[in-house]
Curated annotation (Swiss-Prot):
UniProt source species: Acinetobacter baumannii (strain ATCC 17978 / DSM 105126 / CIP 53.77 / LMG 1025 / NCDC KC755 / 5377)
Active site location: 10
This protein's UniProt keywords: Oxidoreductase
Function according to Swiss-Prot or TrEMBL: Has an important function as a repair enzyme for proteins that have been inactivated by oxidation. Catalyzes the reversible oxidation-reduction of methionine sulfoxide in proteins to methionine.
Reaction(s) this enzyme catalyzes, per UniProt: L-methionyl-[protein] + [thioredoxin]-disulfide + H2O = L-methionyl-(S)-S-oxide-[protein] + [thioredoxin]-dithiol; [thioredoxin]-disulfide + L-methionine + H2O = L-methionine (S)-S-oxide + [thioredoxin]-dithiol
UniProt-recorded name of the protein: Peptide methionine sulfoxide reductase MsrA
GO biological-process terms attached to the record: protein modification process
GO molecular function: L-methionine:thioredoxin-disulfide S-oxidoreductase activity; peptide-methionine (S)-S-oxide reductase activity
Keyword Oxidoreductase: yes
């Protein structure tokens, strides 16, 4: 089992996307990249902790590769807006990839360079994996538990439509 750690805006949205991918065994919403130990959602939302909302993805590399997860990540959020995804503004919503090893770093660098070669101004941060703090229980599997919640109903379906149209071959049955 391998792990990936991505931040691409609200973790509810990112989690909802990656739970659809075959080979993804678990997605845990949480916080990483800041200076506060064991931050709360409220602290992260205030913007003082410097943590990003992230998802820790446990995946079977025999079913889905890290590079494929990177492709999904970049296609389902906007990696060209600094500290912002749609109406969500703040450093906690930054686009970030935390890598666990040199192979992940190289794969991310390659993907970012490919996007830059296509004239995209990528602002995604690439850093070694810091301490990951799981978010509170009510944030886990949030969209699955709250599909009609206003924010989820607005923000997540377009991401899932894009996922289904571009990555059908990676979807769970």
């Amino acid at each position: 089992m391998q792990q990936a750690l991505f931040g691409g805006g609200c973790f509810w949205c990112v989690e909802a996307v990656f739970l659809q991918i075959r080979g993804v065994e678990k997605v845990t919403s949480g916080y990483a990249g800041g200076h506060t130990t064991h931050p709360t959602y409220e602290q992260v939302c205030q913007g003082d902790t410097q943590h990003a909302e992230v998802v820790l993805i446990d995946f079977d590399e025999q079913q889905v590769t890290y590079s494929q997860l990177l492709d999904v990540f970049f296609a389902t959020h906007d990696p060209t807006t600094l500290n912002r995804q749609g109406n969500d503004i703040g450093t906690q919503y930054r686009s970030v990839i935390y890598y666990f090893n040199e192979e992940q770093k190289q794969a991310a660098e390659h993907t970012i360079q490919t996007l830059k070669d296509d004239d995209l101004d990528i602002v995604t941060e690439l850093s070694p994996t810091p301490t990951f703090y799981p978010a509170e229980d009510y944030h886990q599997n949030y969209y699955e538990k709250n599909p009609s919640q206003g924010y989820c109903n607005f923000a997540i379906p377009p991401k899932l439509l894009k996922l289904h149209s571009k990555f059908q071959h990676l979807m769970k049955n």
